[in-house]
Amino acid sequence: MASAVEIVSGRDVPVTIGPYSPATRVGELLFVSGQAGVDPDTGEPAGDGFGEQARQLFRNLEAVLRAGGSEPSLVASTTVLVADMDWFAELNELFGEFFSENPPARMTMQVPLPKGLLISIGCVAVVRG
């Protein structure tokens, strides 16, 4: 019997830094692990600044969403982790650009992040019908 949980992968999907999947698909829902502002080829942070990392994060997030059969306008909920709330205004600007259509629910928290990362976003999205 096939598993009800499908692991999402693809050429443009960044490799995770631990023993977890970039995303899983269950029926019409896509559960995306925390994506970060890393270069998908090297796994290293895409720069030292918040803006650089956030822009790369949104490129990575879009790649994972598309690999799982979804898109930004179908994201229902996000969990945003930032290393410093001083970037909150810039986060709002970039978040609004990426989710310009049907902005999702969002929870934002300040937490320490590993490996020089400044932001991480996980989400739940609907799969295109």
Predicted feature descriptions by range:
Residues 2-129:
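Short, polar/acidic, helix-capping and beta-turn segments at strand->helix junctions
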